[in-house]
């Protein structure tokens, strides 16, 4: 019983020391970006994200380790499962039927864009 409690305490202590390092690694590998703007030509909108020629909003959550060009000021997002891209085409047609919710793309699908 004492040995089990000792290992449980040791495991908890190691978790306390490992948690900040894991959180720092996760923060380094992820970039969260949100923006509101109007897309400007060629499918590239404000902040340099692939976007449509319509106003809207989007929330990006993407792993930077997948981005070979991550040091460029205009990052090209590869859209994994955790990424969400939502746009509302309110200027072209404000009807609710034109609410566009684009499902996340896999990296393989993004390569063909």
From Swiss-Prot:
The stretches annotated as sequence repeats are 32-37, 40-45, 46-49, 50-53, 59-65, 69-75
Record region (2 X 6 AA repeats): 32-45
Q: Where is this region: 2 X 7 AA approximate repeats?
A: 59-75
The segment annotated 2 X 4 AA approximate tandem repeats runs over 46-53
The signal peptide, as residue positions, is 1-18
Cellular localization per UniProt: Secreted
A single GO cellular-component term on record: extracellular region
- Keywords of this protein's UniProt record, alphabetized? Repeat, Secreted, Signal
Its name, as the record gives it, is Protein USP2
Organism field: Puccinia graminis
């Amino acid at each position: 019983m004492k040995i089990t409690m000792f290992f449980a305490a040791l495991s908890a202590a190691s978790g306390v020391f490992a948690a900040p390092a894991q959180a720092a690694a996760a923060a380094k590998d992820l970039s969260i970006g949100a923006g509101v703007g109007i897309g400007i030509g060629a499918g590239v909108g404000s902040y340099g994200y692939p976007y449509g020629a319509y106003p809207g909003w989007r929330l990006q959550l993407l792993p930077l380790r997948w981005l070979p060009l991550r040091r460029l000021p205009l990052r090209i997002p590869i859209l994994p499962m955790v990424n969400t891209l939502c746009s509302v085409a309110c200027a072209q047609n404000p009807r609710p039927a034109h609410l566009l919710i684009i499902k996340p793309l896999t990296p393989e699908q993004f390569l063909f864009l």
